[in-house]
Amino acid sequence: VLGDLIIADDDTIYTTDSLTGVLYRYSVSDKEFSVVVDSGTFVSPQGLVLDVGGKHLFVADYVGGLHCVRLADGRVERITSPDSINTYGIDGLYRHGNELVAIQNGIQPHRVVALALSDDGLSITGSRTLARNLPEFDEPTLGTIVGDSFYFVANSHWNSFDRNNNLPDGLSNPIILKLPL
């Protein structure tokens, strides 16, 4: 099941398979997929974002926290953080300068945080909570950064699907929220 994807400046597409844990690279010119990180490293890769130079890919593993993948050789390093900063349950991941903006819908209460990266990008040095436990939240997920603002879906209703993948009648319309960064 292909999940999140990101397009690099050279039009290479990176995407995750949230069921097998594989990270793929898709060459637009060759129209072919190749494996960057095979199954066994990630449990449920979700959010993806490139570093400023496009040489590393930050991967949010819903169960395993944050990782940094060196794109040249596929080497994976776990991003460390102080015990006081939780990096689990991240669904959406975005970059704003030297911060990773993360939607955490796998922990309670749901929240949106900005995680400050070290200069080498391999550790979290601090965090800011941008939004937490808002009344509009019903599985917040997916967003985008425009300038110094973060727009995201506050109520994906992801947990409302029944076992046949149907949504019940009467759900509220999607709510898009904007947060200053």
Feature-to-residue mapping (PLM):
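Beta-propeller blade signature
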Residues: 114-119, 166-181
